[in-house]
């Protein structure tokens, strides 16, 4: 089950006295509550690739585990997805004001050097907009 986090959580969430904007898609996994301290656990797909990051639960009895997807590219033939906007948790999208790749570029981290060397378009589809050019 996909959750549009901006609609589900009304855009902002407060944690430790700070407001955070929730954006993107998550996956809801029935009967999965990993318990306290498990936020940040990896969600793997059937090919053992990272698909998302576990962050919490939803439902009256915490019966639905939630994982933030790393990447979302909606299919236009699904009504629910047609209203969604493509995004990438690392590279952002046209609506993102701050994103992780921006941080790694500004601080010249090791990850930025690795990103520049990627030749696989599968991992760079958001970067192709003018705003997200990492080169």
From Swiss-Prot:
Species name: Mycoplasma pneumoniae (strain ATCC 29342 / M129 / Subtype 1) (Mycoplasmoides pneumoniae)
UniProt family annotation: Belongs to the MG067/MG068/MG395 family.
An MF annotation (GO) of this entry: RNA binding
Membrane-spanning parts: none
Top-level taxon in the UniProt lineage: Bacteria
Entries under Pfam families matching the protein: Peptidase_S7 (PF00949)
Signal sequence segment: none
Protein name: Uncharacterized protein MPN_584
